[in-house]
Amino acid sequence: MPATSRSFMKRAIGATLLIAASIVGCTQLDAWQREAIFSPVTEQQSWWRDPPEGTQEFDIALADGDKIHAWYWQSPKPNAPTVLYLHGARWNLNGSAFRMESWTDREYSMLAIDYRGFGKSTPRLPSEETASEDAVAAFAELVRRQPDPRKRFIYGHSLGGAVAIDLASRKDLPEYAGLIVESSFTSIGGMLGTLKYGWVPGLNFLVTQPFDSLDKLATLTAPILFIHGTADRVVPHEMSDALYAAATKVAPDLRRLVKIDGASHSSAVRSGNTYWSAVANFTRDATAAYRHRKDDASPDNARQARQAG
């Protein structure tokens, strides 16, 4: 097929999609995308697990009367970091329990939630906006349970990584020590580009749930650890390269990217020493960096700096 014909066909397909979207209507298009992106599974799966032993189960009430279901596991170590875990698409807390258990086995305190539409949370079709609201409510609970910001960490896997980045980018968010993003993507538009028909013009204009992490990362200054398996067949691991590159305001020694050789989309957390050494070193260094930032910003140090000048 001549190049001009191929170009015309691409434009024609793009125009057809735009016309179809207009016919279907924005409301239906939005609902379809939300269902496709979050894909919450409501049927019990044989491999789902109960929460780790000693976990508290409770609900967090939202201002509109909805609720999000939460699990909290308290480490026996008094100085352990406390991690807010934001899971990805499809699986609820029971489907993600293996990931939480991997962290609690290493005695990290952990708070995990189901977005609305998942598990025992209020049944509704989730969206980027509602997931963001749920994460904000969960972080408020994290602050209540962990008053020391040096020990607060945000951790998101896959879609949860995008939710975590959005949460961390909020200007009114209470302080935290660091952000951990695992197996996540640059944006929904970026993910469309990896699909068979991702070249079709106009697709990005149809996205109602952008989850655009790149611009948000460009505003962050707190330490960030990106983790990705090189055998991920859901989200290309190169997307973590782009996420890492976007976090330009983070100090170079506190902006880290770890690739887990041979790990799939969900198995990095099970990969052993490479993963857990990266996490342990990061949480230690981010905690120390927070302390130093606060020491440098103290009134006494500021006064000494002015006098020295």
State where each predicted segment sits.
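Hydrolase active-site cap/lid region
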Residues: 163-216, 222, 270
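C-terminal catalytic histidine-bearing segment of alpha/beta-hydrolase fold enzymes
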Residues: 242, 249-309
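Short alpha-helix in the alpha/beta-hydrolase fold that links the catalytic acid
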Residues: 99, 222, 236-246
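Membrane-embedded segments
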Residues: 63, 67-141, 145
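An N-terminal hydrophobic leader/cap segment in hydrolases
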Residues: 21-61
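Alpha/beta-hydrolase fold nucleophile elbow
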Residues: 146-158
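Acidic catalytic loop of the alpha/beta-hydrolase fold
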Residues: 231-235, 265-266
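Short beta-strand/loop motif that positions the catalytic acidic residue
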Residues: 220, 226-228, 232
